[in-house]
Amino acid sequence: KPCCSIHDNSCCGI
């Protein structure tokens, strides 16, 4: 699954 998803936003860099 992609990093910038509803389950994982910390991967987005926020």
Curated annotation (Swiss-Prot):
The modification Isoleucine amide is found at I14. Contains 2 disulfide bonds that can be either 'C1-C3, C2-C4' or 'C1-C4, C2-C3', since these disulfide connectivities have been observed for conotoxins with cysteine framework V (for examples, see AC P0DQQ7 and AC P81755). GO terms for molecular function: toxin activity. Belongs to the conotoxin T superfamily. Expressed by the venom duct. Its main location: secreted. The cysteine framework is V (CC-CC). The lineage of its organism: Eukaryota, Metazoa, Spiralia, Lophotrochozoa, Mollusca. Keywords: Amidation, Disulfide bond, Secreted, Toxin. It is found in: Secreted. One of its GO terms (cellular component) is extracellular region. This is Conotoxin tx5c. It comes from the Eukaryota.
